[in-house]
UniProtKB/Swiss-Prot annotation:
Its EC number is 3.4.-.-. The lineage of its organism: Eukaryota, Fungi, Dikarya, Ascomycota, Taphrinomycotina. It holds the Pfam family PFF1_C. Its cofactor is Zn(2+). Gene3D superfamilies: Zn peptidases (3.40.630.10). It comes from Schizosaccharomyces japonicus (strain yFS275 / FY16936). This is Vacuolar membrane protease. Residues 1-17, 370-381, 437-454, 504-560, 627-630 are cytoplasmic.
Length: 847
């Protein structure tokens, strides 16, 4: 026992006798937390994780599905559809009684597009399969995945992996009867406007669905993220017994606030049956190759597929095994904490925030009045000035750095997100170090004031987090946000650290200074000086003074120990909570989205503010942890990283720039232009040396659009392209009805835009009877005519209708301008569709 005590004392004195060893200890502690979190981030399920699931078979499905681009408006889509049907019919043959397959060629939907008066009409071509469950009284669960791709991509991640996972789950439940009915919807035309999901809502099977799981791809590869969940009840189905969970509540808030503009089928299903609970499981990384030709089998992995398959299976199993009839609940909140996910009701979370905002400061104030020495130090203006000016300096420094970075190399985060994030951490740490040192030096603090600055700054950090929690709580209540949860960790850690400072002052400081306590308690030192008596010559006997000096000799050792304890409680948890939010979800989701619209440096600002909140807890320790030499090394590292970031190429083969393109041919004027998104100066770098437009006088760039004379498309049409769109008008002699018929060659999409609003009686026999100026029509089969019946309001005033039809197939050189540019562009760039239709041809007719 005595040997153990001696060994512990030896380790204790050796470990905490200097600031350097304390810093090493603190760094080691941070690394332990990082390794714990790294394990959660990088663990993938084994390929044979779930008995009965064959990921190799699913990988074969994926290769079959992604042989070529297969948008809804293509013949390749029919090939993929037939493959899925064949696989499902095999399952039906195994168990005719419990497996039902529907080739849904009858569901038709029409609706008004949100925020517009545009009427959409769509003829669905979904594939539905139903597995009968043991308990017929329980309402069915829906699993959905769309099988169409965009015209410019092979659809490996979006959404081949979702389809392959759904197929493998279908095979599993064909052999393992579920507790309740399972419906799987392999839907078509999601990429155009979620039409497949909308068509499903018209089918009778949709009327009784109680919960759903949607498999999607909003990126290319990586891990499948729980993007959204409607409530905490259904979210538990994802986390229950799931060692491979990967989720963030930030996705819910991003969609809710409109930060993410694109949508998935989730938004259709959640409104089904006046509100249906569900989960949205999607890939989100590598958006630089999302919707491009590099979304193929070569740019993904079987481990990504297996991650989605296993997570989908666990979620679906828990949903099917749920005994309750309804999946009702409140808004969800979930977050990772060092290797595991925590869940809480968002309303309960906000209620507890209000309680903490009232109770915690009350507790601290009541305790503070019992410690006059600490209260006296907190009232000194030098500390408040030091903390406030230093924090303001860091924020101003951050702003200058972000503005400079976005001026000199605005897209650098696209290819170097980790370097930018590391640079922001260094920027904030450097700002804290130099600003605190400068302010403390020029504020003429005494040695005694400098010795207790650590404790005082901990209290000021707690005040900062209290204000942040107040703002975060009010914002969350008003806007229903859950992603501000990281503020709670900062506040709780600082509150707990304040309690520790009271313990230190009460039991480890006040007892040491009772010998020379001044008459006025406010003159009492908060921390004993290491140089002996802080108040001049002692009037006490020499042997008493020696006792005090003997005790003071261990003050530095105790100070170092307390600093490590404070650091361990205050820094790691808030630091890694903010770091996780940035590195796991926010940066991977947005760092390649700057090119999707008008440039904005919002992602830089959000990232640097979050880094500031992660680093601010380190401010009490910068004096002890970093010497002048260490600060100089930190400065050199910052300058080196800045230099590398400024000269880094923002786009490369692994992180290419993505140009939106389309061709428009006006059949009335013969104007034939190919449009390329203008991202200055990179569009010019690609096009200025493009051989086909070097001598093209029509080439010009206006705002966000560059265009030049395009080659005439072929489409495999025999005859002049004028006849590819044939418009005929039949007026009834006995009524005011007029039938507008459009026959378009080999296309399923045509848009009708009238010069004035017209009364639409029906579309392809589907009754509408409303007034509209624009119509969007999608038919089920090639060769089907587009028929719109209208009612004439005034025959003396002619109405013009412009019909625009779309084509997406570019094989066999059908759209030579696209294939030519695709073959020419450098490796650091890719092409993607601008909207529905790589080729748009328009024609105007007078009604």
């Amino acid at each position: 026992m005595q040997f153990g005590k001696s060994l512990l004392k030896h380790v204790y004195t050796r470990t905490f006798k200097s600031s350097l060893t304390c810093s090493i200890f603190a760094f080691t502690l941070l690394m332990i937390f990082f390794v714990l979190d790294w394990k959660r981030m990088n663990v993938y399920p084994r390929l044979d994780e779930i008995p009965g699931l064959n990921v190799l078979r699913a990988w074969d499905d994926l290769q079959e599905i992604t042989k070529s681009p297969h948008p809804y408006n293509s013949h390749a889509s029919d090939v993929v559809r037939n493959y899925i049907l064949e696989e499902l019919y095999k399952l039906k043959k195994q168990d005719e009684g419990n497996v039902e397959v529907i080739d849904d060629l009858s569901s038709t939907t029409t609706f008004i597009m949100p925020d517009t008066n545009i009427r959409s009409y769509f003829e669905g071509s979904n594939i539905l399969v139903r597995f009968r469950g043991d308990n017929e009284r329980l309402r069915p669960i829906l699993l959905s995945s769309h099988f169409d791709s965009v015209s410019t991509g092979f659809g490996a991640t979006d959404n081949g992996m979702g389809v392959a996972s759904a197929l493998e789950l279908a095979r599993y439940y064909a052999e393992h009867k579920p507790e309740r009915d399972l419906i799987i919807n392999f839907n078509n035309a999601e990429e155009d406007y979620l039409y497949g999901a909308r068509a499903f809502t018209e089918h009778e099977w949709s009327k009784n669905v109680t919960a759903f799981l949607n498999l999607e791809g909003a990126g290319a590869g990586g891990k499948a993220l729980l993007f959204r969940s409607t409530n905490n009840h259904v979210a538990r189905s994802y986390f229950k017994s799931n060692r491979f969970a990967f989720a963030s509540v930030l996705g819910i808030d991003a969609f809710k606030r409109g930060v993410i503009k694109s949508e998935t089928d989730y938004v259709v299903y959640e409104k089904m049956n006046n509100g249906t609970a569900g989960l949205d499981l999607a890939f989100f990384r590598n958006r630089g190759i999302y919707h491009t030709e590099r979304d193929d089998i070569q740019h993904t992995s079987i481990f990504s597929l297996n991650h989605m398959l296993v997570n989908a299976f666990i979620s679906l199993r828990n949903l099917l095994d749920e005994k309750s009839q309804h999946f009702k609940g409140s808004s969800p909140l979930y977050f990772p904490v060092f290797g595991s996910y925590w869940q809480i009701n968002l309303n309960l979370h906000l209620f507890l925030n209000v309680v903490f905002l009232i109770a915690c400061p009350a507790i601290l104030f009541m305790c503070l009045f019992r410690f006059p020495s600490l209260y006296a130090q907190l009232k000194k203006p030098c500390y408040l000035i030091c903390f406030t000016l230093s924090s303001l300096f860091v924020l101003i420094f951050d702003y200058v750095v972000v503005q400079s970075l976005t001026k000199l190399n605005p897209y650098v985060i696209h290819s170097s997100p980790d370097a930018v994030l590391a640079f922001f951490f260094l920027t904030n740490l450097l700002g804290l170090v130099y600003s605190f040192r400068y302010v403390a030096t020029h504020s003429r603090m005494s040695n005694e004031e400098l010795s207790c600055i650590e404790i005082v700054l901990i209290w000021y950090v707690s005040m900062f987090w209290y204000i942040s929690l107040l703002i975060a709580t009010l914002t969350s209540i008003v806007r229903g946000l859950g992603s501000l949860y990281f503020v709670n960790f900062g506040f709780f850690c600082s509150f707990f650290c304040c309690i520790l400072t009271l313990i230190r002052v009460r039991y480890f400081v006040d007892r040491m200074v009772t010998i020379n306590r001044p008459a006025n308690p406010e003159q009492m030192p908060l921390v004993q000086s290491t140089s002996g008596n802080a108040y001049g010559t002692s009037r006490y006997p020499q042997h008493r003074l020696k006792a005090v000096v003997s005790k003071s000799a261990s003050v530095k050792l105790n100070d170092n120990l307390w600093s490590v304890l404070f650091f361990s409680c205050l820094v790691p948890l808030p630091l890694f909570t903010c770091y996780n939010l940035l590195s796991e979800v926010f940066i991977p989701a947005v760092h390649q989205s700057l090119i999707d619209g008008p440039y904005s440096n919002t992602c830089y600002k959000f990232a640097v503010i979050l880094v500031f909140m992660a680093i601010i807890n380190s401010s009490p320790f910068v004096f002890r942890a970093l010497s002048k030499k260490s600060s100089a090394i930190l400065l050199m590292l910052w300058v080196s990283l800045l230099f590398n970031i400024l000269r880094a190429e923002p786009f490369n083969e692994k992180a290419p720039i993505k140009f939106r393109v389309f061709q428009h041919l006006n059949l009335d004027t013969s104007e034939n232009l190919f449009h390329v998104q203008n991202i200055e100066p990179y569009t010019q770098k690609v096009l200025n040396d493009y051989p086909k437009i070097i001598s093209d006088t029509s080439y010009q760039c206006v705002d966000r659009d560059c265009f030049y004379e395009a080659e005439e498309p072929t489409l495999g049409f025999d005859g002049p392209l004028q006849n590819a769109i044939n418009i005929t008008l039949h007026k009834s002699l006995n009524s005011s009805l007029a039938e507008l018929r459009v026959d378009a060659f080999e296309t399923k999409w045509c848009y009708f835009d009238f010069s004035v609003p017209v009364y639409v009686d029906s579309i392809n026999g589907f009754e509408v009877q409303e007034e509209h100026q624009s119509l969007r029509l999608g038919v089920r089969n090639f060769g089907t005519p587009f028929v719109v019946k209208t009612v004439a309001k005034d025959e003396d005033s002619p109405t013009n209708v412009t019909v625009t039809c779309m084509w997406d197939e570019f094989d066999h050189d059908k759209i030579p301008s696209y294939t030519s540019l695709l073959n020419y562009i450098p490796a650091w760039s890719v092409l993607t569709k601008n909207s529905t239709g790589l080729l748009k041809m328009s024609k105007t007719h007078v009604m």
